[in-house]
């Protein structure tokens, strides 16, 4: 395991612990900006696991990718904020037009989105993939089946272009959620465990 230390909080975070799958080599992922979000220059997909506070930086990175070309966003946790992306793109319509967004509100819809996503040379970003899989009204075994089916489509899509998948911990940790994360992490080419910088406390004012 390698530890990446970022000098400032304008990246995803101050530190990212990286786990690499022994098979497969990620030839060129560039940090955008100086965090653990990357642009794929070769086939593969990476997993970003961390707090929800990292989402705004991921959206900024999506805007950066849009500056270079088309990018597909699949939103599993209603995390895509068009205003944040537009601000990061400085309101340039040509950048925003290159970003396509699809949303899923159940784990079944997430699988359906991935099934319908064509295998083309356009990088993809899946936001908060496990959000809908935390739904306890769906049996754990069924959630695992759906997740493995989603992974098969991520692997299909990575053959044409790289991608990034983000996940956040559930509000209430539980064994089923951890098992789902383990399944996803085992399938990813690389995993970055993101820790956001904690702002320094303001000094106490006596007067």
Question: What are the residue ranges of the model-derived segments?
Answer:
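Detector for small/aliphatic-rich hydrophobic stretches
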Residues: 1-71
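Amphipathic coiled-coil/heptad-repeat helices and related helical stalk/stem segments
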Residues: 33, 55-58, 110, 150, ...
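Conserved P-loop
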Residues: 39-113
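Short, well-ordered secondary-structure micro-motifs
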Residues: 83-85, 112, 135-138, 176-178
């Amino acid at each position: 395991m390698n530890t990446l230390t970022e000098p400032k909080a304008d990246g995803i975070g101050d530190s990212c612990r990286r786990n690499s799958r022994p098979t497969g080599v990620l030839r060129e992922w560039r940090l955008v900006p100086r965090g653990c979000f990357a642009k794929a220059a070769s086939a593969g997909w990476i997993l970003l696991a961390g707090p929800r506070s990292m989402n705004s930086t991921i959206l900024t990175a999506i805007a950066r990718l849009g500056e270079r070309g088309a990018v597909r966003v699949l939103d599993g946790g209603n995390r895509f904020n068009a205003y944040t992306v537009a601000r990061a793109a400085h309101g340039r319509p040509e950048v925003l037009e290159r970003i396509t967004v699809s949303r899923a509100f159940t784990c079944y819809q997430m699988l359906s989105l991935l099934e319908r996503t064509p295998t083309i040379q356009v990088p993809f970003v899946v936001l908060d993939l496990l959000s809908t899989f935390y739904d306890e009204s769906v049996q754990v075994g069924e959630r695992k089946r759906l997740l493995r089916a989603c992974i098969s489509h991520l692997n299909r899509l990575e053959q044409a272009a790289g991608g990034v998948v983000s996940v956040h911990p559930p509000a209430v940790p539980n064994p089923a959620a951890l098992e789902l994360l383990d399944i996803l992490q085992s399938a990813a080419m690389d995993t970055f465990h993101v820790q956001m910088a904690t702002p320094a406390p303001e000094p106490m004012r006596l007067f």
